[in-house]
């Protein structure tokens, strides 16, 4: 039978519920259990696909094409289970499902209410995420309830998990509550009052936490733990300290040493071998003992919020570990870069990366960045839009197509080398179509797709004969211009098998040591254990580029 752990948060948001949930899952997995994670988001958007990265951070894409919360990226990087559409749902998706049922008459004329109809639907979605009744069923499903206890948006979710816990019966569910202990510098002490109040609020709803994860700047003293235990009705060994660390990969060991996994296994009556966290210890050692450092310039438009490029940041760090170097990432605003100042802004970096994005703001700066990298033979990796700007730059300055652009930025440009895809086939064989009037939400080319890779290319040395990666885009290299670009020397090294859409462009080794653009998002498949072949090759190229510069 699948057991459930419900993770809630209090006092403030952004405490790290996603990391805490993923860390607990990783420890339980190391005990030999099959684990999955489910993220419940209280906002009314159907999914985060149309939300601004400034509002929400990165949109993480799964193999089955779901646009999900960035926490699912943490989940995939921490545990072996792959995430799917069912692992993330929102208030919007719940209400959409309830209203569709009401229109079909599934409720037999009853008045549709939050309790029981919405709360029942939430419970069904949770069970679906846990794979109950399917071959994907797990031993433990960890459900992270987004938002903060006390938010009006979270109430239906908290009521739903309370009801589900009751239905599951004793020893089949546990509650973990993440809270915050502020440090008052003037008084020189940690304050427990906000934690007392947030647990009081949770208990009013009918939920008694089994464990409290207390986020603080430093470890929580024992006398404070005793006080928290007394006022929250949580056993003292269930009051667990979560202090700030320099790498998230230290969190599993931190929680294990304070007995969180033992407490959960006892509560859920799970008889397992002891946790083996050796690979996490090795990972932490690798991050703390680099043999060098490389400087990477990431040129984008959402640079004020690093969460907008969370998976790219992590993939670069993973690749650094594979090459035993520390990767120092500098986020540069593409709006500040021009052909005239590109050298001044970019000369000190060992490699340049242009990540994905949407809209025309800052795009000319990205084109200038691609030009600088090409002309100065700096290793360049373009992802999604980064591949498109590299194509536009090459068309303008090498292929002689003056005025080349994307129809996303200029609908009437003279040479639309990048244009809207109107038809493509999904991995399951269904043909999707769209036009300029299609809704923004859910109309992109999404999820895992496979392409053939041309032998003798840089891409082939990285991927082999076939590349399967996740996509999230509406625009694509225009097939009508491929021959002109090839004639001018651009290598189209991977094409999709059915539509012959461009997946990878690159420059020959004789022209540039390492210059590649990919239409897909490789960052979503990077893991701390092996990195990702494309990012690993990129960081190796950065290390190589550093050598002559270091000698000089």
Curated annotation (Swiss-Prot):
Amino-acid positions noted as binding ATP in the UniProt annotation, renumbered to this chain: 14-19, 71
Domain of life where this protein originates: Bacteria
Catalytic activity: UTP + L-glutamine + ATP + H2O = CTP + L-glutamate + ADP + phosphate + 2 H(+); L-glutamine + H2O = L-glutamate + NH4(+); UTP + NH4(+) + ATP = CTP + ADP + phosphate + 2 H(+)
Annotated source species: Acidovorax ebreus (strain TPSY)
Misc. comment: CTPSs have evolved a hybrid strategy for distinguishing between UTP and CTP. The overlapping regions of the product feedback inhibitory and substrate sites recognize a common feature in both compounds, the triphosphate moiety. To differentiate isosteric substrate and product pyrimidine rings, an additional pocket far from the expected kinase/ligase catalytic site, specifically recognizes the cytosine and ribose portions of the product inhibitor.
Native organism taxonomy: Bacteria, Pseudomonadati, Pseudomonadota, Betaproteobacteria, Burkholderiales
Keyword Nucleotide-binding recorded: yes
Similarity comment: Belongs to the CTP synthase family.
EC number: 6.3.4.2
Domain Glutamine amidotransferase type-1: from-to ranges: 295-548
Pfam families on file: CTP_synth_N, GATase
Name under which the protein is recorded: CTP synthase
Modes of activity regulation: Allosterically activated by GTP, when glutamine is the substrate; GTP has no effect on the reaction when ammonia is the substrate. The allosteric effector GTP functions by stabilizing the protein conformation that binds the tetrahedral intermediate(s) formed during glutamine hydrolysis. Inhibited by the product CTP, via allosteric rather than competitive inhibition.
Residues that hold L-glutamine according to the record: 357, 385-388, 408, 474
Residues of the active site: 384 (nucleophile), 521, 523
This protein's pathway: Pyrimidine metabolism; CTP biosynthesis via de novo pathway; CTP from UDP: step 2/2
Subunit comment: Homotetramer.
InterPro entries: Class_I_gatase-like, CTP_synthase, CTP_synthase_N, GATASE, GATase1_CTP_Synthase, P-loop_NTPase
GO aspect biological process, one term: pyrimidine nucleobase biosynthetic process
Keywords: ATP-binding, Glutamine amidotransferase, Ligase, Magnesium, Metal-binding, Nucleotide-binding, Pyrimidine biosynthesis
